[in-house]
C-alpha cells in the first residue's frame, strides 16, 4: 500500500488507552510484575474519586487504568468478550473495547508465549492469521500476516501479544466491503472510496 499521511492532524500514534479496574494493587502486580511494564505515573483523584495509574507500553505509548470506588461489575459478553479467540464467542457490545494488542517482534514471539505460560498466565491457542477461508494456519506460511496469542488480565480485559510477520501492506490487502448495521454490504464505502493522498 502506498505510504500515506494524515494531512488534517499530526497524529503520532496512541498516547494512552484508559481502562477501569476493580483492584489497582492487583492490576499493578499483573502489568508491572507479570508483564514487566514500568509504572510511570500514579494519581489519587481529588475528593476520594479514585485513582488513575499509567504503565509504559513502549514507543512513548501508555496503558492507563482508573479505579473508581463504585464502578459496576464487568459483564463478560457485553462489556468485553466472553471467550478468547480460538475458544468461542469473541463478540462484545457496541462501543466496548474488545481487546488490546501489544506489538512484539517476530523473533521473540514463541519465547514470549512460553514466558507467559511459565508465569502462570492462561493462554488461548497461538493463532497464525492468514488469508485462507478459515483465516488461521496451523503453521507459519508466507500467507500468514500476523501471529497472535490471547489472554486475560485480572479484570477480564482481553490482551494479545501480536507480531506482524511481514513489513507493510499491499493495496490488495484492502479487499472487503464494510457492512452496515444490518450486516449488508450495500454502501460501497471501502472499495469505491477514493485512495488516500500519498505522502510527498
Identify the meaning behind each predicted range.
Residues 1-9:
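A detector for short, charged/polar N-terminal pre-domain segments
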Residues 12, 24-25, 82-158, 166-170, ...:
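Vicinal oxygen chelate
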Residues 16, 51, 147-148:
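Conserved beta-strand and immediately adjacent loop positions that scaffold enzyme active sites
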Residues 20-72:
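Core segments of cupin and vicinal oxygen chelate
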Residues 63, 159-162:
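Short hydrophobic beta-strand motif reused across regulatory alpha/beta modules
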Residues 74-79, 170-173:
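A short, polar/proline- and glycine-enriched secondary-structure boundary/capping micro-motif
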Amino acid at each position: 500500500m502506498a505510504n500515506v499521511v494524515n494531512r488534517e492532524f499530526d497524529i503520532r500514534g496512541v498516547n494512552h488507552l484508559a481502562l477501569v479496574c476493580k483492584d489497582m494493587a492487583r492490576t499493578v502486580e499483573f502489568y508491572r510484575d507479570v508483564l514487566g511494564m514500568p509504572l510511570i505515573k500514579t494519581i489519587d483523584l481529588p475528593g476520594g474519586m479514585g485513582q488513575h495509574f499509567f504503565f509504559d507500553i513502549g514507543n512513548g505509548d501508555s496503558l492507563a487504568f482508573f479505579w473508581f470506588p463504585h464502578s459496576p461489575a464487568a459483564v463478560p459478553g457485553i462489556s468485553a468478550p466472553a471467550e478468547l479467540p480460538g475458544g468461542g464467542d469473541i463478540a462484545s457490545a457496541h462501543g466496548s473495547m474488545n481487546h488490546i494488542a501489544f506489538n512484539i517482534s517476530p523473533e521473540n514471539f514463541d519465547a514470549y508465549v512460553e514466558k507467559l505460560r511459565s508465569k502462570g498466565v492462561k493462554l488461548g491457542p497461538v493463532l497464525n492469521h492468514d488469508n485462507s477461508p478459515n483465516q488461521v494456519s496451523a503453521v507459519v506460511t508466507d500467507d500468514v500476516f500476523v501471529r497472535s496469542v490471547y489472554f486475560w488480565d485480572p479484570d477480564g480485559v482481553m490482551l494479545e501479544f501480536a507480531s506482524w510477520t511481514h513489513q507493510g501492506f499491499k493495496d490488495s490487502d484492502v479487499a472487503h466491503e464494510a457492512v452496515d448495521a444490518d450486516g449488508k454490504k450495500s454502501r460501497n464505502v471501502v472499495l469505491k472510496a477514493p485512495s488516500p493522498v500519498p505522502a510527498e
